[in-house]
């Protein structure tokens, strides 16, 4: 049996990050379609600054189809069983971000593995986002650029990034197009990835942070983004920011994750 794409010139990405590859589905999950991707990139997988391992699997995701603007897409939502890993919970009351809003300590016992679950109302803001950072100033920026309809994750200052200078581009990427389509491109590791989004009033965002990764799931997995990061110590502080107006964080829970 031969399958042909009805739109060979249209790419619908399952994940918009740099480090989602070789997705494998399980065959014994009943009516559910559950997949696990490899979390790395052939551009730099052999030179990442790790000792005990070179790569790992990302979180298992449940795949499903949905329709948007008369187009069919594949969503990838974290499987609900991940909730059993939640240990400590920190619930932060609703707040408005007019310029910035600081959270000086995310979790009391933070070893670098946690989940952030947020519900956001856009308001008048053009840019709305937050930085996860540590005492050394290493940070990851995650933000919505609403005029350009983009969700962005910027890891250019996330920690150890200089090994990216030795990245080897894929054969199809030897031209410079990847440099112009990325945001804040420094090299094939130090950059920002982005996903197209619909401009909506409310967004639900799940962010999973581990010792060397950040995985984003927007609106139940309609957008997923997986990126490696290598901070020298866990991100335990947070700063929300806005430009062009304010936005509202209606719900915000932080969970320490563990076995």
Which functions belong to the PLM regions below?
Residues 7-18, 24-259:
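Beta-rich accessory regions
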Residues 1-2:
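Short, small-residue-biased leader/transition segments that mark boundaries at the very start
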């Amino acid at each position: 049996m031969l399958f042909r794409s009805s739109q060979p010139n249209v790419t619908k990405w399952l994940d918009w990050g740099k480090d989602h590859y070789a997705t494998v589905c399980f065959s014994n999950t009943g009516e559910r379609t559950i997949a696990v991707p490899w979390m790395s990139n052939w551009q730099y997988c052999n030179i990442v600054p790790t000792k005990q391992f070179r790569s790992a699997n990302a979180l298992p995701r449940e795949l499903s189809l949905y329709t948007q603007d008369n187009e069919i897409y594949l969503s990838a939502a974290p499987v609900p069983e991940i909730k059993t890993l939640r240990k400590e919970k920190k619930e932060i009351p609703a707040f408005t971000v007019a310029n910035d809003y600081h959270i000086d300590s995310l979790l009391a016992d933070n070893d670098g593995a946690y989940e952030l679950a947020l519900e956001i109302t856009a308001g008048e803001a053009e840019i709305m986002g937050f930085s996860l950072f540590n005492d050394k100033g290493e940070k990851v920026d995650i933000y919505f650029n609403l005029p350009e309809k983009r969700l962005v994750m910027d890891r250019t200052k996330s920690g150890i990034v200089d090994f990216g200078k030795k990245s080897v581009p894929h054969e199809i990427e030897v031209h410079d197009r990847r440099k112009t389509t990325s945001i804040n491109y420094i090299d094939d590791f130090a950059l920002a990835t982005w996903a197209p989004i619909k401009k909506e009033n409310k967004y639900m965002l799940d962010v999973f942070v581990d010792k060397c990764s950040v995985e984003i799931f927007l609106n139940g997995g309609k957008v997923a983004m997986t990126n490696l990061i290598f901070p020298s110590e866990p991100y335990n502080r947070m700063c929300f920011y806005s430009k062009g107006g304010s936005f509202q964080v209606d719900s915000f829970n932080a969970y320490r994750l563990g076995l």
